[in-house]
Amino acid sequence: MDLLADCPTRLAFDLVANTWNPVVVWALRHGPRRHGELRRTIGGISAKVLTETVRRLEFDGLVERREGAYALTPLGETLLEPIEGFGRWAAEHGDDVVAAQNRVRPA
């Protein structure tokens, strides 16, 4: 797997590296949602950040706006399985990561 700056794999990592991209994609997995409903579903995201995120996802071809609601495109739907995999990994290893972050570091 090549992870150079201009490789396709790096592009995929960039799509899920943004804090809100995978959250918004996951929140749309059951179908279209209006901006306010999407914001309530997610929680903890400002209206401005949500707007910026859905616009970026639209630009990337992952989300489209139809009749005032945001929905995943077929391309966006292909991200659901990898996002679910990250969620499983976090559930299994999240405590280990937190423990590592809380270790006392040598001076």
Regions picked out by a protein language model, each given a short descriptive name:
Residues V54-R55:
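Short, hydrophobic-biased segments on the C-terminal half of alpha helices
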Residues R65-G87:
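Basic, amphipathic "hinge/linker" alpha-helix immediately C-terminal to the N-terminal HTH DNA-binding motif
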Residues M1-D2, T9, L75, A91, ...:
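Proteins with a high burden of low-complexity, intrinsically disordered sequence enriched in S/T/G/P/A and R
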Residues D2-V49, D60-L62, A71, E77:
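N-terminal helix-turn-helix DNA-binding core of bacterial DNA-binding proteins
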Residues E81-A107:
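Amphipathic alpha-helical dimerization/coiled-coil segments
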